[in-house]
Swiss-Prot record:
Disulfide bonds join C446-C449. The lineage of its organism: Eukaryota, Viridiplantae, Streptophyta, Embryophyta, Tracheophyta. Acts as a protein-folding catalyst that interacts with nascent polypeptides to catalyze the formation, isomerization, and reduction or oxidation of disulfide bonds. GO terms for cellular component: cytosol; endoplasmic reticulum; endoplasmic reticulum lumen. This is Protein disulfide isomerase-like 1-6. Widely expressed. Its main location: endoplasmic reticulum. It comes from Arabidopsis thaliana (Mouse-ear cress). The gene is PDIL1-6.
Amino acid sequence: MLTKPKPNSKFSILFTFLLLLSFLIFVARSSDVAVEAGSEEELDDLEQLLAVDEQLQEERPEQQSEAETVSKAQRIVVELNGDNTKRLIDGNEYVMVLGYAPWCARSAELMPRFAEAATDLKEIGSSVLMAKIDGERYSKVASQLEIKGFPTLLLFVNGTSQSYTGGFSSEEIVIWVQKKTGASTIKLDTVDEASGFLKKHHTFILGLFEKSEDSSGHDEFVKAASLDNEIQFVETSSIDVAKLLFPNLKTNNVFVGLVKTEAEKYTSYDGPCQAEKIVEFLNSNKFPLVTKLTESNTVRVYSSPVKLQVMVFSKTDDFESLAQPLEDIARKFKSKLMLIYIDISNENLAMPFLTLFGIEDAKKTVVAAFDNNLNSKYLLESDPSPSNIEEFCFGLAHGTVSAYYKSQPIPDNQNASVVAVVGRTFDEVVLRSSENVLLEVHTPWCINCEALSKQVEKLSQHFKGFENLVFARIDASANEHPKLTVDDYPTILLYKTGEKENPLKLSTKSSAKDMAVLINKELKWKDQSGKDEL
């Protein structure tokens, strides 16, 4: 969840919205208690203030508004500055820091969740100090903390920082912090405790061990809990507690099961009680059958151990008819691939992916896939019906779908001195051609490409009449081919007859005359560099 340290002027409308949002946040924060917290006494004062606040709320609970609840939560979070940061981090065993910027929309989204997490941690007796710092106002301090973008979450343990790797809901923040600073599991002994737990936790993994300390599987369950940073692990020795948490429970023996809020709410684990196997089960089942991509869960989705990900880009209304069929498809290919829904009207999420396929103007449903192990992408080019999507997934799971390479439409090159090559014609024009091919690889945003293109035009005129030499160019931003791997632009490649697999890279800093000399030398032609065209 990182954004650049400065807003992008290209998105002026979005920036105006962010400024308005930042102003509203500033107004909300203006009522916060200013806390220096430079010493234990200052933190004690904060605790006393919160205690008074809680007493007042108990006396008038019906008058407590949502704004007051948020205000209270925000007061629990200490504001760091240039004077108190070092003292607080060095003086506390655990400090969770949120680095934010007033103009950052994602910071604005995260701050109330962070404050809510701080409230929950306080209520369960956590010793973690929750703090935030305006990284733009205190840029030097933020830099010293190694805050490089916004928002950034860091946990300091005895003054040493570690990056945050959890989710971005308040519940996920609490789970991650607890696992890093306290017990990796929660023990529930009574039905009342379980009822209270269910009010705050919606996704968790349950372990039933009749005699927790003596169970052979208990240690493995606890070990699995420490290996996972996202899901809350709950253990109990009470059958009644277990049945309240997992109504589908069918055994009184050792049991492990996952509870979620989505379809497949209750999933039993039937493998051996080994930490690695439990985590593997969790990774295969913790996401919904069809995951909706949001800005807050992108990191979790991209880091999923299921690396073959099928993405359905669709408008909300159009997706409704696909939702149930997609869940059925997901069940068939669970652990082999992951199905993800992206609202095609959300440009921030959809556009980067659609651009990779050269279909950024798409308005109707698009089904695509990425294999992050093979670094390859795929596109369903037929109608995105449920049956076609299932066939597409079957082919992906069995490795029978060809990778997709984007291409512009095939151009009309009649009478062109420099032939335009696209992804679909690269084989025909460049690789399978019996002629030598000098290929200019460019992009629209390349600064030096225009000057080089003029040189290539001159060279094409200079060698006009040489039937065994073709001059060509390809826009690498809109066309791809597995045999075309270029890292910088512009690039000039000479594909010699009989040696097409190993093209010669020419210096783009050479003059047209020098290039002509090199071409003559490589093709063993009589030097033509003295002709007037150069």
